[in-house]
């Protein structure tokens, strides 16, 4: 069983009580309130000996109790990780079941609060084990795989503008400033019995690869070149580089910046 330590009201780091991860990795997280009254994002990194789980959850500020939705989803998925033997036998099924359970618990939260309450959240999650990464997302929280200075992979948002992009009606550059950028098509805690979720297959990791999970408060205010420079900057700790990246995103959208959160992992070797 793992132990979790809360290092901020919305950030968690968890590990086995008497073991250090055998994986050669460097991890970091950041969560900034931006120019909002409350930080409704939640971030967690859970490190077992043979597997690591990264989580970034964005409580939807336009809905009641977004912070509680994010907290509920995070604790549910952390519990699923610690209750599953590592390395996880079927990563894709694990991610599907964990997200489904998180959705169920957020729906239950809304029912317990009041008939009118509909707490919701978007989510990005990544499991790292056996020299590979498996990820999943719901909504517009993203996962990036960065190699050297390039974006090798990124998740595709469940959002209206992503549909427009896929259909060729707008360009990638137009996504960031589009007036409907914040309209998500699905989320944890929504009306569907099970939200649409995208679950990746196995992504092989090479030394130096960086996995970045982030809320829209970060990616919407940075360019791919910014993320590439972040991945390539190995002269200082990943923690410092990620903090700098978060601050840059907040400054880029001041004085209207959103909550801005991310978790990152640099793969060194098995």
Model-derived segments and spans:
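PP2C/PPM-type serine/threonine phosphatase catalytic domain
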Residues: 1-270
């Amino acid at each position: 069983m793992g132990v979790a330590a809360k290092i901020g009201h919305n950030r968690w780091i968890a590990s086995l009580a008497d073991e250090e991860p055998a994986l050669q990795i460097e991890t970091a997280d950041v969560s900034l309130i931006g120019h909002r009254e409350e930080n409704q994002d939640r971030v967690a990194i859970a490190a077992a000996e043979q597997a690591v789980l990264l989580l970034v959850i964005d409580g939807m500020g336009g809905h009641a109790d977004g912070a509680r939705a994010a907290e509920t989803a995070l604790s549910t998925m952390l519990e699923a990780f610690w209750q599953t033997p590592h390395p996880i036998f079927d990563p894709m099924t694990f991610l599907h079941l964990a997200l489904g359970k998180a959705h169920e618990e957020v729906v239950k939260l809304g029912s317990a609060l009041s008939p009118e309450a509909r707490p919701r959240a978007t989510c990005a999650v990544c499991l790292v084990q056996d020299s590979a990464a498996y990820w999943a997302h719901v909504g517009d929280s993203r996962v990036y795989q960065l190699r050297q200075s390039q974006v090798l992979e990124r998740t595709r948002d469940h959002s209206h503008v992503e549909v427009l992009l896929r259909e060729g009606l707008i360009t990638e550059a137009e996504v960031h400033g589009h007036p409907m950028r914040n309209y998500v098509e699905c989320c944890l805690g929504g009306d569907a019995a099970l939200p649409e979720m995208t679950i990746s297959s196995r992504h092989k990791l090479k030394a130096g690869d960086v996995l970045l999970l982030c809320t829209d408060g970060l990616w919407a205010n940075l360019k791919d070149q910014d993320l590439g420079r972040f991945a390539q900057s190995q002269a200082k700790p990943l923690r410092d580089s990620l903090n700098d990246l978060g601050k840059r995103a907040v400054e880029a959208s001041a004085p209207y910046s959103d909550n801005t959160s991310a978790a990152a992992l640099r793969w060194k070797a098995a």
